Every structure is written in C-alpha cells, then in structure tokens.
C-alpha cells in the first residue's frame, strides 16, 4: 500500500543545508536522508509518466505558465542550470517535461531528451538548447505551430534540485507573422488541459513590473482554481520595477493584493544583456543573491525565504513532494479502478484473431458455440438479462396473455347481447319446430361466427411474437458477432430466412386449427359437465333474485334459454382450447423450432473452411480498439507493479 505520510514536511533540502556551516559528514548524512525520502517520490511519478500513464490518469505535477516575455524560460533555466530555446514569438511549442535529478557532489552532469519514441543522450549542457529546438521541429514542424506531444528533458547534476516541472507555451493574444490565426485559442486549450487537473500545481510566472490583475496567465489559473489552493505566483524582473512602486511588489509577494493560498515567490534571472554578455547561470545566481541582499525593499523578502532561485527550488521541491504524498493513495485507487474497467472492456472485444488455419477453426467454433448456447438459453427462458430488461419468454408470455384476454372478451358478451343475437337467429332460421324446441342450426351458426372472428387476431399475434423473437435473436447476434461484420451479416440473414419459413408454417397451422374449429365438437362427458355447471349457475342466480317478473317478461321462448345455456357451455370449452392451442403452435414453430434450426444452420458454417477468413474478418475500429485497450492495460499493470514496490 502507498501511504501519504512520509515525513517530508519536516525534511530540509540539501540545497538549504549546503549554505550553512555543517561539516562534510553532516552534509552527507542529510543528503542520504534527502535521497531516501524525496527521490523515490519524484522518481515514482516520473516513471509512471514515462510509462504513459498520464494518457489514462492525471499525475501530480507542477505546470509552469505565463504570458509571453514573462521570464518563464529564464526561471526554468535558473532552476535547471541549462539554456533553453529563446527568441521572439512562440519559443515553447510543445509541452516540455523538465525532470531534474540531484546527484552527489562527485557525480558528473548527465542529460537526455526523449520524444516520439526517441531517446537522445546529451553529452554536454551546452547542447540542450539545440536538441530541444530540433525535437520541437520534429514534432510541430518548421514555423510557429504548436503540438500537444510531450518532450521530456532529463537533467542530472549536483547543482539542480530534485524536481519535475512541465513547461507550457507562453500565452499570446495576437497572431503575428506566419502564426495560425487561432494561435491564442490553441495555446490556451493546451494550457487548460494541464491546469484543469486537480493533481496539478499551477506555477504562474508574472513580471513584477506589470499590474498583476491584468495578466492572462493568472486569470486562467484563477478560472480553474478560484480559491488559489494549488497556485503559486512567481514574480520576475524585480530590477525593472519603477522606483516608488517597490512596496506594491512587496505587498503582492506577501499575499496582500491577489490572494493565493500557496502564496508568491520573487526571483531575478538573467536579462537579455546578461545573456548577450554570456553570463553563466552560476554567476547569475550569485548576482541575484547580492541584488536582494542589497535592495532596501526586497531584502526582507529574502530573509522571509520568499526570494531567489535557490529558495524557489527548495519551495517547489517541498510542494511537489507534499502534493505527491497527498495524492498517491487516490492515484493508487484510480489506477486499480481503471485497470479493472479496462480489463472488463477488453473482454468485450475478445482475443486477437489467430493466424493459423486450425486455430481459426477453433476460434470460429468457440464464437458460434457461445452464440448457440445463448440462443438455446433464450428459447428456454434461462438467458441472463440486465436489471431493467425482460427475458424473451416473459415478453412472449405477455403477448399470450393479451391473446387470452381477446378470446375471453370475444366470448364474454352480456346476457342481453347474446339473447338478442339468439332471438334474431330464431326469427330468421327457425323451421318447422314448435316453440321450446332447440334449433341446432341456430346454435352451430352462432358458434362458428364467434370462432371465425378470432382467426385474424391469432395471425396478428403470431406476427407480433415472431418479430419479438427475431429482434431478440438479432440482438444476440450483435452481442456476439458485432465486431465481425461478415459473420454478423450471415447470422442475420439466417435469422431472417428461418423466421420466414417458421412463421409460414405456424400461420398454416393456426389457420388449419380455425378450420377445424368450424366443426362444432366436444367430448360428451366434457360438454355435459360444462352444461351442468352453466345450468347450476343460472339456477343459483334465479334463486337469488327477489322477483323474476322482469326476467320472465324478457324471455318469452323456452328455446332461447336452452340455446343460451348450450352456447355458454360450448364457449367455455372452445375458449380454453383456442387460448391454449394457438400459443402452443407459436411456441413450437417460431420459438423452439426457430431456435433449433438457427443453431443447426450456424453450425453448418463450419463446413466451409474457405470462408473462415471472410467470416472472422474484424472491423478495423475493433482491431484498433483492442490494441489500444491492451496498451492501456499493460501501462496500468506496470504502474500497479511500481506502486506496489514503492517503499511508502
């Protein structure tokens, strides 16, 4: 586990200790403590950044921003001890990760620049500016365009602090020369990409001789960090401050003007004349200290530890270490969660398609077998569904319930409606029979009519259920074969062909059933039992009536009551028969047989080996996505391994 409490806050940097009067042994012991506590933290984050983890998660960092000509490059030069590209216009054209590593006094200077998968050793500090310029040209091309591609500069020296900074292009407001018209927008978008992250400390460089409230860099930092919790202000060019305004500068540094929770520092770096006269960076540091010691207004800031490059280096190292220690537990958890999410997402894309023909066959078998198993589970009502979805059988059963209601509604007409219909048939079709004799033709005609009107609703239900099943099977195909467009297309074609075939068979069977229902038939014992129940029910209702005068006046012919009882008894039986048998037909043809035929048809694809390559051809975006996810997963796996080994 990574722990946030590493005891860093109470540890002085070796930079500050070397300015004291301790003997060499004390210096050595302090440096060892510093190496033990500080270096592992920074090295860990640098190693994660070198892995590319920043493509997946934000890492603790210090981003350096400033308006053009704010002195940003001079500050970085003073901290790193190397010259960086200079000139007019846009000089920093790519984000520059400046990794500073403090070495022991006996060690020699080392440098290395990395970009676009290239790594170039730099033998001498004087070559840094040239290598950075060439790297920017390689990435962003000739001219003044910018790029989001990182350049990493690693400087190892006894004279630099342990620190990692990200230098961003200076903010420009107006495109000049051959700069893109939207150069201001491009630069600000690049800067926001970094300073928006809560894991980033924003180091805002502002000239001391300008109104701090008008600087674009500080305004951008305030937009993303309104409380100033992770912003440090750096004032430069104190030697250019107008006489009489020094106290205002002191007030700014003391956080009395534009409040930042982390406050301000002030430094004096090499000016243009100093560079022209080739003043060394060491000499510039000496001159800087003398400037603050001798300045009537600024010497107090030096005593308060708020002035000079060495104080800034110590402060930034301390801030970065505390920031790293604070964010490491969260970072570890984020990496773990992201690793799990990417692993799950990668599983959806399956394995890479094998090259060997025999392996391709097994790959296709596996995919078809998985598809077939889900189809069978689906038709048996055992498939897995998401929380708010329903199983196929549940959807089909709902349609069957609607069908049952349609049948029931068709037969359940009120007394008056049925009696009226019976009376009409009596008046139209009664033959030689005396009153009180039941006309079987009347009974049969009414039954046939009521059954016949259910045929088309039954066929409509068949089409509805078939569409539901076809759509479900297509969804299963998409789930398993969507990344293989030929295999998915073939499966959909088979799903449609078998649907038409089975739907036609089911419709024939349904229409045949309704033709058979035109033969009025019921088992004698079943019919007698149903008729007896109807008569008993009517007798009970008659018994419960207080007066049957109204009823008798409505039923003038005994045959009407008799036919009504027979109709009701037969309706009950035919209703049960139709309600159950039509769903059985549909289940048999367009659910079970449909699924089984589809399974067999998919297995037949394995017989044509010449089609394997065609069937297993992936979408280009699928292949690229799998590769992208595998790269991310590898990065995160290595990041977790490094975090696990961190001695926190």
From Swiss-Prot:
ISGylated. It is found in: Cytoplasm; Endoplasmic reticulum membrane; Cytoplasm, Perinuclear region. Residues 56-329 form the Dynamin-type G domain. This is Interferon-induced GTP-binding protein Mx1. Pfam families: Dynamin_M (PF01031), Dynamin_N (PF00350), GED (PF02212). It comes from the Eukaryota. Residues 91-93 are annotated as: G2 motif. Residues 236-239 are annotated as: G4 motif. Residues 543-546 are annotated as: Critical for lipid-binding.
């Amino acid at each position: 586990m990574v722990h946030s409490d590493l005891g860093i806050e109470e540890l002085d940097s070796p930079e500050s200790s070397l300015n004291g009067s301790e003997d060499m042994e004390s210096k050595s012991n302090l440096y060892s403590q510093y190496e033990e506590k500080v270096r592992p933290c920074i090295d860990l984050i640098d190693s994660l950044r070198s892995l590319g983890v920043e493509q997946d998660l934000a890492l603790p960092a210090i981003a350096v921003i400033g308006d053009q000509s704010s002195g940003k490059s001079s500050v970085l030069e003073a901290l790193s001890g190397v010259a960086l590209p200079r000139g007019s216009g846009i000089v920093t054209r790519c984000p520059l990760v400046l990794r500073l590593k403090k070495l022991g006094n006996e060690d020699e200077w080392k440098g290395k620049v990395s970009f676009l998968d290239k790594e170039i050793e730099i033998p001498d500090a004087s070559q840094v500016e040239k290598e950075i310029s060439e790297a920017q040209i390689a990435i962003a091309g000739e001219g003044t365009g910018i790029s989001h591609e990182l350049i990493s500069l690693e400087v190892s020296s006894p004279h630099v602090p342990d620190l990692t900074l990200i230098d961003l292009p200076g903010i420009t407001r107006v495109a000049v020369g051959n700069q893109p018209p939207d150069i201001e927008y491009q630069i600000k978008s690049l800067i926001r990409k970094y300073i928006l992250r809560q894991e980033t400390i924003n180091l805002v460089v502002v000239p001391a001789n300008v109104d701090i409230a008008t600087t674009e860099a500080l305004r951008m930092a305030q937009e993303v960090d309104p409380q100033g919790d992770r912003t440090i202000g750096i004032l430069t060019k104190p030697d250019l401050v107008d006489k009489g305004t020094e106290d205002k500068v002191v007030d700014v540094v003391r956080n009395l003007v534009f409040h930042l929770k982390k406050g301000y520092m002030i430094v004096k770096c090499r000016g243009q004349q100093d560079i022209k006269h080739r003043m060394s960076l060491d000499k510039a540091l000496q001159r800087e200290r003398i400037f603050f010691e001798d300045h009537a207004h600024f010497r107090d800031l030096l005593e308060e530890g708020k002035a000079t490059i060495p104080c800034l280096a110590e402060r930034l190292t301390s801030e970065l270490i505390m920031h790293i220690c604070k964010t490491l537990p969260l970072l570890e958890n984020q990496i773990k969660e992201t690793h799990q999410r990417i692993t799950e997402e990668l599983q959806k894309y399956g394995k890479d398609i094998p090259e060997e023909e025999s392996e391709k066959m097994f790959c296709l078998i596996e995919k078809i077998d998985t598809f077939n198993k889900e189809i069978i589970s689906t038709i048996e009502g055992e498939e897995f569904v998401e929380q708010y979805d329903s199983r196929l059988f549940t959807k089909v059963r709902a349609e069957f319930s609607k069908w049952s209601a349609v049948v029931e509604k068709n037969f359940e007409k009120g007394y008056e409606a049925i009696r009226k219909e019976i009376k009409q048939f009596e008046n139209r079709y009664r033959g030689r029979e005396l009153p009180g004799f039941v006309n079987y033709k009347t009974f049969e005609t009414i039954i046939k009519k009521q059954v016949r009107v259910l045929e088309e609703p039954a066929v409509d239900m068949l089409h509805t259920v078939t569409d539901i099943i076809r759509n479900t099977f297509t969804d299963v195909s998409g789930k398993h074969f969507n990344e293989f467009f030929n295999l998915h297309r073939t499966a959909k074609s088979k799903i449609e062909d078998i649907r038409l075939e089975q739907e036609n068979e089911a419709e024939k069977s349904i229409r045949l059933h309704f033709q058979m229902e035109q033969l009025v038939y019921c088992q004698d014992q079943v019919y007698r039992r149903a008729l007896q129940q109807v008569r008993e029910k009517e007798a009970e209702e008659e018994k419960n009536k207080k007066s049957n005068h109204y009823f008798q006046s409505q039923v003038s012919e005994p045959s009407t009551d008799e036919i009504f009882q027979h109709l009701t008894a037969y309706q009950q039986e035919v209703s049960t028969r139709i309600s159950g048998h039509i769903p059985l037909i549909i289940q048999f043809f367009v659910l079970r047989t449909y699924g089984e035929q589809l399974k067999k048809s998919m297995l037949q694809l394995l017989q044509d080996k010449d089609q394997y390559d065609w069937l297993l051809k992936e979408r280009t975006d699928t292949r690229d996505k799998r590769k992208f996810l595998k790269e991310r997963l590898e990065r995160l796996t290595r990041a977790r391994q490094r975090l696990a080994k961190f001695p926190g």
